[in-house]
Amino acid sequence: MRLPRFFALLLAFRLPLGALMAANPPAVVIATYNVENYLGEEAVAAETGGRRSRPKAEKAIDAVVQVIKDINPDILGVCEMGEPERFEDFKRRLAGAGLGYRDFEYVQALDSERHLALVSRFPIVARQSLTNVSFELAGRPEKVRRGFLDVTVQIASGYQLRVVGAHLKSKLPTPEGEALVRRNEALLLRKHLDEILAADPAVRLVCLGDFNDLKNEPSYHEITGARGKTYMTALPARDELGDTWTEYWKAADLYSRIDYIFVSPALHREVAPGSPRVYRSAYWNDASDHRPVYATIIPSNRP
């Protein structure tokens, strides 16, 4: 006998019935984190002229796991995950730290070294990630190198989150112009968000990741869109000292805010006041050149 999908999810993820049936679902912590080259021995940095990248050191990996443990997110979007075997290593380490993630998404697009990924304590009930997104630049065909992560997560009965992840072109120079590449990627990302919002204006949509642009730059404004019913709000995160930067670019000695969590109007009203944060600790830089951004959602079953 085939079980209905809802009860199959209960069995597969060993979730108590009450957790999914509750009128007021539990609070959900969402986070985005560029873990800086979670790569293995054979990785090659395509964006840096083919120079071979160093594998991520054990000390750095341990620090990454500790940072995630400190935040303890329920849903974590990851940038710069390495090859599939590195993602398996990442998952094992998170499990060993007692973090208890039960479902996963991993995007294999054009960039063979750096991938988007997601870990979740809640079941993923739909996978819509895009791995082959094309555009034309100066008469030449181009692709979004990391693709776009896109999943639907079932938080409770009648309550889902649509999570889109992105890692736009870095600021490292390219012949075609890195800013133009990044803006085209942002345009395509916004097109994807518009399609989601057009299909369901009440969708609880979050878009998170490393966007490699500041708030006053074109790519950022492409993603937020025009003020109105489809505007994607960037959550105003800061750390306990009031700092908002999320990346330290050592080569330029530059601190910047380039990692964001954007939310749709329907989800914005469910963000816990004061919860958006930028992570800070004494060992953040041992782990990565980025700091995670996270926020708490207080779900409501109202339409």
Identify what each model region corresponds to.
Residues 27-40, 130, 160-170:
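Active-site-proximal beta-strand elements of phosphoester/diester hydrolases
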Residues 81-160, 166:
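Structured beta-strand-rich core segments of catalytic domains in phosphoester-bond hydrolases
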Residues 48-55, 72-80, 105-106, 137-138, ...:
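Second-shell loop/turn segments in exported
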Residues 143, 152, 193-206, 212-303:
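Metal-dependent phosphoester-hydrolase catalytic domains
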Residues 36, 81-82, 123, 167-169, ...:
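Catalytic metal-binding/acid-base residues of hydrolase active sites
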Residues 2, 20-97, 103, 108-113, ...:
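N-terminal, active-site-proximal structural segment of metallo-dependent hydrolase catalytic domains
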Residues 44, 155-186, 191:
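Metal-dependent phosphoester/phosphodiester hydrolase catalytic core
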Residues 7-19:
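Bacterial N-terminal signal peptides
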